[in-house]
Swiss-Prot record:
Catalyzes the 2-thiolation of uridine at the wobble position (U34) of tRNA, leading to the formation of s(2)U34. Disulfide bonds join C103-C200. The active site is at C103 (nucleophile), C200 (cysteine persulfide intermediate). It comes from the Bacteria. It catalyses: S-sulfanyl-L-cysteinyl-[protein] + uridine(34) in tRNA + AH2 + ATP = 2-thiouridine(34) in tRNA + L-cysteinyl-[protein] + A + AMP + diphosphate + H(+). Residues 150-152, 314-315 are annotated as: Interaction with tRNA. ATP binds at G12, M13, S14, G15, G16, V17, D18, S19, M38, G127. It is found in: Cytoplasm. This is tRNA-specific 2-thiouridylase MnmA. GO terms for cellular component: cytoplasm. Residues 98-100 are annotated as: Interaction with target base in tRNA. Keywords: ATP-binding, Cytoplasm, Disulfide bond, Nucleotide-binding, RNA-binding, Transferase, tRNA processing, tRNA-binding. It holds the Pfam family tRNA_Me_trans. It comes from Limosilactobacillus fermentum (strain NBRC 3956 / LMG 18251). The gene is mnmA.
Length: 377
């Protein structure tokens, strides 16, 4: 049996069941485990309760239960500078950003690794559902987890070899159900704790509009069909995303009782374009352009400048077949779907896969239906 006692693993602990079981498993495997709670946002609510304080108490309880030291580190400044300002800037451009992808790249696997190194870490570990595989040349590859319904490679798609070489994902071979059972069997106080949802700085109560309006002034404007008919008033373009159905306040017409969906935005005119029907032609793109490309591995040497793979355009979506074509300088990518893709959203990540391997990702800029650019921003 391998003696892991001289290998220090610093675990990012959130106070949730996944990261708690991560620490537990590593402790059981004999590693020298240290727990660290990352405070990324001052999330005191209207009642003066800071959920981070409650979560830290849970970290302390779990760490004490399994017998490991624990610390708290404050990354509020790093988070503001590297993640939150990006989030707001994207909304100013009329886009819909995904802060989790950037947070993992900049905070959980950058600032956190730098801090863990100060604690003498050989590795860091998190409660993400993802797997790693090292090839014969020694390069690390990012792979999907066993529990495909919980797989989080989408959010880890901007990590690089240096980060992955330093990381352990102990939950790779477990389902969520099994993780909860492990927590119960060990008597962990968080065994039945609800999973956190939503963006950390908005919290679970989902007061998104209220929150965003503190940083960006909302400007009402017209809701129009693509042929210019005014059908309503929007509360501010930043509050809507492509393909959105809820919250439009529009009913059916005599001619058409289909529900309304957001099909586009014009940020210069402050117009929100809406259309009826889930299958509305204006919601479908044949191809898209994306930038801020990041490859986990050297994709060009493996596949060339043009290749076929699968992709996700949002986290919960099934993989879709796509053809990827890189620009000559490698800074832009054109992604052509095998079948037209619905509700492609600028600001979101398009994440590429070869089977179970996550190849990397890019940030969507524009979407097209044949030669016609969709009115997405």
């Amino acid at each position: 049996m391998t003696d892991n006692s001289h290998t220090r693993v610093v675990v990012g602990m959130s106070g949730g069941v996944d990261s708690s079981v991560t620490a537990l498993l590593l402790k059981q495997q004999g590693y020298d485990v240290v727990g660290v709670f990352m405070k990324n946002w001052d999330d005191t609510d209207e009642n003066g309760v800071c959920t981070a304080t409650e979560d830290y108490k849970d970290v302390a309880k779990v760490a004490t239960q399994i017998g490991i030291p624990y610390y708290s580190v404050n990354f509020e400044k790093e988070y503001w500078d590297r993640v939150f300002t990006y989030f707001i800037d994207e909304f100013k451009k009329g886009r819909t950003p995904n802060p989790d992808v950037i947070c993992n790249k900049e905070i959980k696997f950058k600032a956190f690794i730098e801090y863990a190194n100060q604690l003498g870490a050989d590795y860091v570990a998190t409660g993400h559902y993802a797997d790693l595989k090292r090839d014969e040349a020694g390069n690390m590859h990012l792979m999907r987890a066993k529990d495909q319904t919980k797989d989080q490679t989408y959010f880890l798609s901007q990590l690089d070899h240096a980060q992955l070489d330093k990381v352990l994902f102990p939950l790779a071979g477990y389902t969520k159900k099994e993780v909860r059972q492990l927590a119960k069997d060990a008597g962990l106080v968080v065994a039945d704790k609800k999973d956190s949802v939503g963006i950390c700085f908005i919290g679970e109560d989902g007061h998104f509009r209220e929150f965003l309006s503190q940083y960006l002034p909302a400007q009402q404007g017209e809701m129009q069909t693509v042929d210019g008919k005014v059908v309503g008033t929007h509360a501010g373009l930043m509050y809507y995303t492509i393909g959105q159905r809820k919250g439009l306040g529009l009913g059916g017409t005599k001619e058409n009782n289909d529900p309304w969906f957001v099909i586009g935005k014009d940020i210069t005119k402050n117009v929100l374009y809406v259309g009826q029907g889930y299958e509305n032609e204006h919601l479908y793109a044949t191809h898209m352009e994306a930038s801020d490309i990041h490859w986990v591995d050297d994709v060009v040497s493996r596949y060339g400048m043009e290749f076929h793979c699968t992709a996700k355009f949002r986290y919960r979506q099934k993989d879709e077949g796509v053809t990827v074509k890189l620009s000559d300088d490698g800074q832009m990518v054109t992604v052509t779907s095998d079948d037209p893709a619905r509700a492609i959203t600028p600001g979101q990540a398009v994440v590429f896969y070869d089977g179970d391997e996550c190849l990397g990702s890019a940030i969507i800029d524009r979407a097209y239906n044949q030669e016609r650019q969709l009115q997405y921003v």
